[in-house]
């Protein structure tokens, strides 16, 4: 009876609590996400409504992702500049969600408030087949909701939308107050 309690330590007990293993099977994720899309699709009447519902669900996930990342980071500092927050999203958040960094981060030439995160082959759209009548549907609206929540809860309120351009492009449009604060910080 005592023998089962005195064996060598199991690998499970030796894992660190701070950085748990966060890998999820791709097939399990694909199944869960496709069911989520089907569930939302059965309750809406247009592609715009479906994308809005996916974005709303993404915002709920984004708030939790930010909490988890901040709790796990050792010596994490709070970003005060827009570029730092965007690099955090492109790097740490993307790695936590998809296992790699986003492909590109760009700023719009004509607008200081607009930035783009470009993902050539987004994992979120890989296993979703879209019927012809819904050809404008981009399920990356879910990812846009996640990014919007991470930025908003970090103190950088923004509106994030997903578009088809060079793969999938997330267009991030910050509120004017965020850009004004960023310029004031640069002036110090």
Curated annotation (Swiss-Prot):
Keyword Phosphoprotein present in the record's keywords: the answer is yes
Q: Which GO terms describe its cellular component?
A: cytoplasm; endoplasmic reticulum; TRAPP complex; TRAPPII protein complex; TRAPPIII protein complex
Residues annotated as coiled-coil are none
- What Pfam families would the database entry show? TRAPP (PF04051)
UniProt xrefs under InterPro entries: NO_sig/Golgi_transp_ligand-bd, TRAPP-I_su5, TRAPP_component
Q: Where in the cell is it found?
A: Golgi apparatus, cis-Golgi network; Endoplasmic reticulum
Q: How does the annotation summarize its subunit structure?
A: Component of the multisubunit TRAPP (transport protein particle) complex, which includes at least TRAPPC2, TRAPPC2L, TRAPPC3, TRAPPC3L, TRAPPC4, TRAPPC5, TRAPPC8, TRAPPC9, TRAPPC10, TRAPPC11 and TRAPPC12.
Protein name per Swiss-Prot or TrEMBL: Trafficking protein particle complex subunit 5
Q: What is the lineage of its organism?
A: Eukaryota, Metazoa, Chordata, Craniata, Vertebrata
């Amino acid at each position: 009876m005592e023998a089962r309690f005195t064996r060598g330590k199991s690998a499970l007990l030796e894992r660190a609590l701070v950085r748990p293993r966060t890998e999820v099977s791709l097939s399990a994720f694909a199944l869960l996400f496709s069911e989520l899309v089907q569930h939302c699709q059965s309750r809406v009447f247009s592609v715009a409504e479906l994308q809005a519902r996916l974005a709303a669900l993404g915002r709920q996930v984004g708030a939790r992702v930010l909490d988890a990342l901040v709790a796990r980071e050792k010596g994490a500092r709070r970003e005060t500049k827009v570029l730092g927050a965007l690099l955090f999203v492109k790097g740490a958040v993307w790695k936590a969600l998809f296992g790699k960094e986003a492909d590109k981060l760009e700023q719009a030439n004509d607008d200081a408030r607009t930035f783009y995160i470009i993902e050539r082959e987004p994992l979120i759209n890989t296993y979703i087949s879209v019927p012809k009548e819904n050809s404008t549907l981009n399920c990356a609206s879910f990812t846009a909701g996640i990014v919007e929540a991470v930025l908003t809860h970090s103190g950088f309120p923004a509106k994030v939308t997903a578009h088809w351009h060079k793969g999938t492009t997330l267009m991030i449009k910050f509120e004017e107050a965020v850009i004004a604060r960023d310029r004031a910080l640069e002036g110090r």
